[in-house]
Amino acid sequence: MAQDHAQPSGPDLARGIALAELADGGKLVGHFGGEEVLLLRRGTEIFAVGAHCTHYHGPLVDGLAVDDTIRCPWHHACFDLRTGEALRAPALRPVACWSVEQRDGKIFVRGKQAQPKPKPVGKPPGETPKRIVIVGGGAAGFAAAEGLRRGQYEGSIVMLSNDDAAPVDRPNLSKDYLAGKAPEDWVPLRPDSFYSKNRIDLRLNTNVTGIDARSREVALADGSKLPYDRLLLATGAEPIRLPIPGADQTHVFTLRSLADSRAIIERAGASRRAVVLGAGFIGLEVAASLRARDIEVHVVAPDTRPMERILGPEMGDFVRSLHEEHGVVFHLEDTASAIDGKQVKLKGGGTLEADLVVAGIGVRPRTEIAERAGLNVDRGVIVNGHLETSAPGIFAAGDIARWPDPHSGENIRVEHWVVAERQGQAAALNMLGHREKFSGVPFFWSQHYDIPINYVGHGENWDELAIEGDIAARDCLLRFKRNGRVLAVASIFRDVESLQAEVSMERDIST
């Protein structure tokens, strides 16, 4: 995550540039009034929008233009070139738009346009629900609430969260924030004033004990009941706890919440050596962040290679070597059997000293509320293509939802931030009575030191791996196939190709 405060680059667009400098389909960054502006040409039309994605400030000039949209190269947000509107997460804020004049063979930017108000969501048949309750304060829950208000829904919104902090940018908790590269004021998705201003009744430290689908009421731990017309379950997933002696000690952590990340940071300040249990995405992002704090890090995992099941053996070897280059020591094909004070005992017989232990051995969906309510649950809450559960009026989104994925043809559940946000946005529409199928192609990213790994699609049970480029040179694209069909694509510094793969999968769904 980065912010760029350098002087604007490129030509002064108020003075104009020659039309010949911007070929059809071309992009160019200049500046107007001290702000960087992206020019993009489509035939005879010239668009002028903010040069940076509103999510993490990614350079849109390096993105992909598709029809009247521009997609961010970093995390696949998408913006409308005509209005600047953020069309898909992870960006939730629009980019600015400027007026453009073509005269005497030149292109001039004339002024920033007023940001249009988001179009109200069209009214579907039937009665609009007056009361919407959202259980969960993570990506899906926040995106649903934000999307409802952005779409000018006027009814009641209550968001129930058992966290003690308002919704945060959770991917940052294991990346830049944990590494000490991002201040805490980057972490909240919105300031506290956002919720009151938008009439979102955010209730923190609130536990839901049950749902009565017949009476349409949510039961809270304090004994009160909350009526709803539509309900969204977005309870997310929770870290799997270590089932070994000593896992309850104060220097042993899991990572999910802002409070967890704060606690790890505090402990890291007095630590010389850390042991990370698990070599998945969270475990290795934590390892990289702790190395950034100059802490000795040992990673213990039962795998032969890190992340081999998802990314394949070649990428697994690369990830291991990347971390070893930065000083991480791996203890693979082994697990912890006990934690005795500052000693982590390994099943293989060794012992590691640790001032700090972080367990990243996986997560499990929080489905208990859904189960008690009698909803269909099978390794997640079963939903249809509209994200509605087996109980009419109750929807589910995010890490708990198992939905029919049109690309793979399977019912899948994924634990990705962007997917959760996009499902929250789709659920918001469908709670209002729309019947829009969720057909988004899954996407996630992982950051290891200065190396980003982007992943598009869902490649479970792949049987063929095609590698383009050079993984060791950090310039590659991997296609995961089953029966010759591409299910997923992973890449390092192949941003446009990653976006093109996403578009191809989307078009494959629509045909």
Spans of features found by a protein language model:
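N-terminal pre-ligand scaffold of iron-sulfur
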Residues: M1-V66, E101-A114
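A Rossmann-like FAD-binding core segment of flavoenzymes
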Residues: F32, E154, R190-L220, K225-L226, ...
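FAD-binding core/adjacent interface of flavoenzyme oxidoreductases
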Residues: L60, P73, R82-K106, R110-V133, ...
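Beta1-alpha1 glycine-rich phosphate/pyrophosphate-binding loop at the start
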Residues: T128-D201, I240, A287-I310, Q500
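Mid-to-C-terminal Rossmann-like scaffold of FAD/NAD(P)H-dependent oxidoreductases
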Residues: T128-V133, I400-V496
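Glycine-rich Rossmann-fold phosphate-binding loop(s) that bind the pyrophosphate
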Residues: G136-A140, R256-S257, G278-G280
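Rossmann-like dinucleotide-binding cores of NAD(P)H-dependent redox enzymes
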Residues: D164-A165, P171-P188, R262, S271-R273, ...
